[in-house]
Design a protein with these regions (language model features):
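Multi-pass membrane proteins that catalyze or facilitate reactions on polyprenyl-/lipid-phosphate substrates
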Residues: 1-226
């Protein structure tokens, strides 16, 4: 939930425009009319919908995927894999696509990256930003689309988590601790988004590769010592 708040704070302008355009789109459907060209905010809504579709393929195996988090060898290898993707990201030719020119296939491929990122140890933002760069997105748009694409995913994950918590029985004494966690996640998430925007301008996503490699190797070493 904290991550969702951070995205809303960082991209409120885009979210507001999409909400407005969503209702305008309903009105256009009622009148059987389509504006030409399609407004950027409306195209962005459609791109996000297409990018979210691959997640539905993961739902039937959600428990199995989550179970991989207990295998630290898998998590370590996934971190190293993420590092290689980020390293390659800076070496891809800079794209120019934004919501005005990105295709449905582009969005679908980024969505596949997001589905792969449900695997423990694979960074969701790292995977989707890298996928965006690979399909030719302008770097700042790759970051923006990555986080806007996270809204349906994070919202769905929170709904499932709340459902599980209700079934397990929520302890009232734990609510304040949960709220503190949400606040910390919101602040941290917002700062991370600002940092990624800065890195997008500088074109240095590969700097995160070394962090992922170090974390991955450390995970494998510590697991091997046990």
């Amino acid at each position: 939930l904290g991550t969702l708040i951070a995205v809303f704070a960082a991209y409120w302008g885009d979210i507001r425009d999409m909400v407005v355009e969503f209702f305008r789109g309903i009105g256009d459907l009622a009148h059987r009319s389509t504006p030409t060209p399609v407004p950027p905010a409306r195209r962005l809504i459609l791109l996000i919908i297409v990018g979210t579709l691959p997640l539905f393929a993961v739902l039937p195996i959600r428990k199995t995927v989550q179970g991989l988090g207990d295998n630290m060898y898998f998590v370590g290898a996934a971190l190293i894999f993420t590092g290689f993707l980020l390293f390659l990201c800076d070496r891809v030719r800079r794209g120019r696509k934004t919501e005005r020119s990105a295709t449905w296939l582009d969005a679908l491929l980024v969505g596949v990256g997001q589905a792969v990122a449900t695997l423990p140890g694979v960074s969701r933002s790292g995977m989707t930003i890298t996928a965006g760069c690979f399909v030719g997105y302008e770097r700042r748009f790759a970051v923006r689309f990555s986080f806007l694409l996270s809204i349906p995913a994070v919202l769905g994950a929170n709904i499932l988590s709340i459902k599980d918590a209700v079934q397990a029985g929520i302890v009232g004494a734990e609510v304040p601790m949960y709220l503190v966690g949400v606040a910390v996640a919101a602040v941290t998430g917002y700062l991370c988004i600002r940092l990624l925007k800065y890195i997008a301008d500088k074109g240095r996503f590969g700097a995160f590769a070394y962090y992922c490699w170090a974390a991955g190797v450390l995970t494998l070493v510590l697991q091997g010592i046990k």
